[in-house]
């Protein structure tokens, strides 16, 4: 992808650009183009490292499968993103990059001026955090129901609500999203705390 980006910018804009797929703040702050591999649901949560983005930077969100991420109510840190499927033809990818770069050149607001309290990133409710923590540990619905003193039906209801909120469609996608949340250590801080409390018990 980085080689393709370099070729596109030289051919279309006669520019040499800085590209990063490293999610460290110093790398993000220097990059003209940020390449992110997105798992299902990940587009809806906060990514604090993106707050370091410089003005007019472009994000390429790379995804797999037929389920394209939606542009509705994206978190502010994903401003100026274009979605690219890994199986798309190179010609289409080039066009997307061209139009995305042209569009982000007109941005006038610096990323650090975005107000996080106005952001529409999604989080888990306290009860969903508890259910998600147990699923992340590998507990079955019956076990979760017993531990939380709720019915199995209620456990499945919370699970469906989580999956609906983040537009995910399988247990694998749910586990992958929870893994991303834990790695980011920001979207649901109580998720990590709940896991620590469970380990102490």
Map each language-model feature to its residues.
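Short alpha-helical "packing" element that flanks the helix-turn-helix/winged-helix DNA-binding module
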Residues: 128-135, 162, 174
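Regulatory hinge/linker segments at domain boundaries
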Residues: 106-133
